[in-house]
């Protein structure tokens, strides 16, 4: 690793199951609990919240959009997995190319993946020729500066590359690293694969990480593609299961989430159970967003948006929205105006019905 060095999703939905403590998987039942003017930031109502049914198409014809990060003015930077482009999307739908990230090797589920902003830096995670890595570039609002590698050596594969990155309230960078199609790596603390990693903005290992000298924050993960912090600083993660259960997990430092020894709720004291689980045909979860005591989880194979009340760190009964209306949903992100932006993902080669004439799109969803 520099600073620090160190899969595939089925297509079908199921219902979450409540638990105590997440992955990507095949078919089963429904989850159980164990373009407008530039928006002005508003004071949101108390949560939990849910979609109002007011959905606007912000922009169309994107090429495999994977992640987005909002700027203060309500516009967003969007990554395209296969083209390696970063594009600026205005709330009124105006689209501008900011630049192309050099060194991206797009194949299978790999390519230009997660994006995050921190101070004057723009961070992205991508698949390179020999590994997955996190880099940063200075961003002046119009163009990208020189690329600096901060984490490298994360195992890559045609599937299970993880890819989501997010800064926590502690100022540290959290990285979802997939198992790169080798489940044994998830239990190997000497490998960064199958983990959630935590590093400083420069890519160094923080002194207070749970394993001395290691970027590993939690382990036993198959393919984490959603990361979000709630108002209390708790970290939530969505994870693809294999053939049985997809998961929503509440992440604790140093804990083992079980893959590949267990999938879903195991009630085994050796592992942390997911907070909720879904059969893989109802979820195949990717990006998640937190808004007012609520987690919103985008479903790829499930082709729906899950709304999950999470008051006090516990999960209520999930509810599905937009089932099949927009196809595969890659990511959900809370906008500065209090709405939710959704990325569709029907141009990624995995859609059962193929892309529609306007795919891929960004949708703006009102919340109440």
Where are these regions (language model features)?
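Surface-exposed loop and turn segments in beta-propeller and other repeat-based domains
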Residues: 96-107, 147-161, 199-218, 255-280, ...
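Repeat-solenoid scaffold signature
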Residues: 216-243
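Sec-dependent bacterial lipoprotein signal peptides
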Residues: 1-2
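Secondary-structure boundary elements
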Residues: 142, 168-174, 198-211, 229-233
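Short loop/turn segments immediately following beta-strands, especially the blade-tip
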Residues: 136-144, 197-206, 251-259, 263, ...
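Acidic, Gly/Ser/Thr-rich repeat motifs that build Ca2+-stabilized beta-propeller blades
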Residues: 5-18, 22-182, 234-240, 282-312, ...
């Amino acid at each position: 690793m520099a600073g620090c060095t160190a899969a595939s999703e089925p297509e079908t939905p199921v219902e979450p199951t409540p638990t105590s403590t997440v992955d990507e998987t095949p078919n089963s039942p429904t989850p159980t609990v164990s373009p407008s003017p530039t928006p002005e930031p508003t004071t949101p109502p108390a949560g939990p919240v849910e979609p109002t049914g007011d959905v606007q198409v912000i922009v169309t014809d994107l090429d495999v959009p994977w992640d987005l990060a909002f700027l203060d003015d309500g516009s967003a930077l969007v990554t395209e997995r296969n083209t390696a482009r970063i594009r600026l999307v205005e709330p009124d739908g105006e689209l501008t190319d900011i630049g192309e990230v050099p060194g991206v090797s797009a194949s299978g589920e790999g390519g230009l993946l997660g994006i995050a902003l921190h101070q004057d830096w723009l961070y992205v995670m991508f698949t390179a020729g020999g590994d997955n890595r996190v880099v940063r570039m200075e961003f002046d609002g119009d163009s990208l500066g020189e690329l600096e590698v901060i984490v490298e050596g994360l195992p890559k594969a045609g599937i299970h590359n993880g890819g989501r990155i997010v800064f926590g309230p502690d100022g540290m960078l959290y990285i979802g690293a997939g198992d790169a199609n080798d489940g044994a790596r998830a239990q190997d603390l000497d490998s960064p694969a199958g983990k959630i990693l935590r590093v400083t903005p420069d890519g160094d290992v923080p002194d207070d990480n749970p394993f001395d000298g290691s970027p590993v924050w939690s382990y036993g993960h198959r393919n984490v593609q959603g990361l979000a912090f709630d108002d209390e600083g708790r970290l939530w993660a969505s994870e693809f299961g294999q053939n049985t259960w997809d998961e929503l997990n509440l992440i604790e430092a140093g804990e083992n989430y079980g893959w590949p020894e267990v999938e879903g709720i195991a009630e085994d004291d050796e592992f942390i159970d997911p907070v909720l689980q879904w059969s893989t045909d109802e979820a195949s979860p990717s990006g998640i967003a937190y808004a007012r005591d609520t987690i919103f989880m985008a479903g790829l194979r499930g082709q729906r948006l899950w709304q999950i009340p999470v008051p006090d760190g516990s999960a209520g009964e999930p509810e599905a929205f937009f089932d099949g209306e927009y196809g595969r949903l890659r990511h959900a992100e809370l906008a500065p105006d209090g709405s939710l932006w959704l990325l569709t993902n029907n141009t990624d080669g995995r859609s059962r019905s193929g892309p529609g004439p306007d795919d891929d799109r960004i949708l703006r969803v009102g919340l109440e």
